[in-house]
């Protein structure tokens, strides 16, 4: 078992934290806004660990669902499950175990948060299979990656206000943007094996679609900042995030594979500076 441990870590992408960070930033945004900048440390720990665990569980489920497709894609052919180094039942067992630990984390929280967690698990577990049916499965991914937002509001306020759903919508647009750039890396392979992705659906309009999704996401955050009367630190963070999106355009405009992958990874900075703006607004407002 110990000899297989490194394979399990690769299965759940512990060597690639970018996915966890893309889940974490929107969740932290929600925690800070829901608590007026003063989230309980215990909640921050619970949601940070929950984000890591559920993203890891999602990776295991994704590799299980895609195991027959991944062997035909150069980038994924050597994943532990695809290459036969671990078995399918091991991936399922790991996913279930991680999901159970995640549920244990939220046991101290209120009933609404627990109810929403059931929806979150369902969406996360079914996302990998949506790539067979949906033309833009990245939108479904945005719901899965962003469900920590309504859960955070529920944990703090015991309700989910409209602003939480607006933030979830923003996350859907953001996910479509960054994951389309990611899908552009594998587009040729995905076309051969019949996988459905937004990069294939958007076709020659892929770059335009990505930039429109960034614009929609940033537009929602303009409304959010105005509605909550945020000060200049927030708008500085927003401007930095907008600058990141423009930089991403320079990377994806020629559709070069590695540049598209770099744009995907750089979204960590976009999410980070936006959260920094929110946190700085509340921190400076106290003084």
From Swiss-Prot:
InterPro entries tied to this protein: HB_polyprenyltransferase-like, Prenyltransferase, UbiA_prenyltransferase, UbiA_prenylTrfase_CS, UbiA_sf
Transmembrane segments: 30-50, 92-112, 133-153, 158-178, 207-227, 232-252, 266-286
Catalytic activity: all-trans-octaprenyl diphosphate + 4-hydroxybenzoate = 4-hydroxy-3-(all-trans-octaprenyl)benzoate + diphosphate
UniProt-listed CDD domains: PT_UbiA_COQ2
Needed co-factor(s): Mg(2+)
Keyword vocabulary terms for this entry: Cell inner membrane, Cell membrane, Magnesium, Membrane, Transferase, Transmembrane, Transmembrane helix, Ubiquinone biosynthesis
Pathway: Cofactor biosynthesis; ubiquinone biosynthesis
Membrane topology annotation: Multi-pass membrane protein
Coiled coil: none
EC number: 2.5.1.39
Protein family according to the UniProt entry: Belongs to the UbiA prenyltransferase family.
Function: Catalyzes the prenylation of para-hydroxybenzoate (PHB) with an all-trans polyprenyl group. Mediates the second step in the final reaction sequence of ubiquinone-8 (UQ-8) biosynthesis, which is the condensation of the polyisoprenoid side chain with PHB, generating the first membrane-bound Q intermediate 3-octaprenyl-4-hydroxybenzoate.
Protein name in UniProt: 4-hydroxybenzoate octaprenyltransferase
Organism expressing this protein natively: Burkholderia mallei (strain ATCC 23344)
Lineage: Bacteria, Pseudomonadati, Pseudomonadota, Betaproteobacteria, Burkholderiales
């Amino acid at each position: 078992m110990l000899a297989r441990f490194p394979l399990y870590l690769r299965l759940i992408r512990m060597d690639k934290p970018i996915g966890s960070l893309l889940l974490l930033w929107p969740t932290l945004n929600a925690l800070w806004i829901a608590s007026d900048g003063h989230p309980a440390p215990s909640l921050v720990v619970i949601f940070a660990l929950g984000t890591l665990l559920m993203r890891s569980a999602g990776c295991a489920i994704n590799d299980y669902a895609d195991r027959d497709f991944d062997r035909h894609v150069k980038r994924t052919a050597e994943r532990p499950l695809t290459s036969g180094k671990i078995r399918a039942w091991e991936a399922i067992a790991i996913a279930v175990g991680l999901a159970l630990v995640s549920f244990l984390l939220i046991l101290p929280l209120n009933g609404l948060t627990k109810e929403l967690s059931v929806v979150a698990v369902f969406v996360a577990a079914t996302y990998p299979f949506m790539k067979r049916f949906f033309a833009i499965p990245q939108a479904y991914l945005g719901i899965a990656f962003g469900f920590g937002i309504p859960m955070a509001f529920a944990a703090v306020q015991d309700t989910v206000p409209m602003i939480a759903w607006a933030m979830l919508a923003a996350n859907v647009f953001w996910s479509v943007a960054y994951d389309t750039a990611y899908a552009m890396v594998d587009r040729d392979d995905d076309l051969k094996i019949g996988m459905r992705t937004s990069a294939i659906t958007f076709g020659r309009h892929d770059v335009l679609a990505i930039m429109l999704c960034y614009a929609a996401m940033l537009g929602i955050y303009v409304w959010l900042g105005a509605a909550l009367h945020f000060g200049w630190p927030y708008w500085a963070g927003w401007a930095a995030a907008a600058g990141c999106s423009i930089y991403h355009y320079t990377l994806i405009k020629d559709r070069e594979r590695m540049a598209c992958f770099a744009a995907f990874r750089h979204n960590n900075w976009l999410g980070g500076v936006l959260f920094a703006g929110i946190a700085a607004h509340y921190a400076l407002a106290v003084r």
